[in-house]
Amino acid sequence: MHILIISISYFLGSLPTGFLFGKFLKNIDLRLTGSGSTGATNVLRNVGKWPAFFVFIIDVGKGLIAVKIAQHYTNQNLFEVLAGIAAISGHIWPIWLKGKGGKAVATGLGMFIALSWKIGFASLGIFLIILAKSKIVSLSSISAAIFLPFLMFLDIGSTNHPYFFISLVVSILVIWKHRTNIRRLLKGEELKINDINK
């Protein structure tokens, strides 16, 4: 059962939401457009606001549902974390798109809302505050990722816990997936959200 749920979590995470929206609405391959990501920000940049909103919600749902399925069948924290990792792995490295997917932000958010709603919504709050001030999605995502392990530590009070471990892994993964954005940020070349679709 555990292996089955992990497999389901991966395939759930690998559903190419953004790619499908790009193909059906604009006949474009998001992997070859903009940042090359299939996540909501690249959908916003190349497809539109409402498609990006729906992609974001669905991608959040992928991480949330994967963990909720695991929680339904077990109360083991480690297994919940493994299901979340599987969903995130599917989102970043989807089998359907030859391993080229998103950047783990929305699916990771869904996972943490399921693991600890306080941490999930606190991270979302940090993202929205930075976005309101900077108007830069990548900077907001990176900032939320940096704070994530600290928020988790404050919540559970231990570094020797699967939740803290996954918060650290996801933090590093999100920052690594944004490495090209970081280079553009340092050069002052990163697009602001109000520059998108102009």
From Swiss-Prot:
Residue ranges annotated as transmembrane are 1-21, 50-70, 77-97, 111-131, 136-156, 157-177
Keywords, A to Z, come to: Cell inner membrane, Cell membrane, Lipid biosynthesis, Lipid metabolism, Membrane, Phospholipid biosynthesis, Phospholipid metabolism, Transferase, Transmembrane, Transmembrane helix
**GO molecular function list:** acyl-phosphate glycerol-3-phosphate acyltransferase activity
Classify the main location.
Answer: membrane
Q: Give me the Gene Ontology terms describing cellular component.
A: plasma membrane
Q: What class of enzyme is it?
A: transferase
Q: Which GO terms describe its biological process?
A: phospholipid biosynthetic process
UniProt-listed Enzyme Commission number(s):
2.3.1.275
Q: Which Pfam families match?
A: G3P_acyltransf
Pathway per its UniProt entry is: Lipid metabolism; phospholipid metabolism
Q: Which family does it belong to?
A: Belongs to the PlsY family.
Q: How does it assemble?
A: Probably interacts with PlsX.
Query: Know the name of this protein?
Result: Glycerol-3-phosphate acyltransferase
Natural source organism: Prochlorococcus marinus subsp. pastoris (strain CCMP1986 / NIES-2087 / MED4)
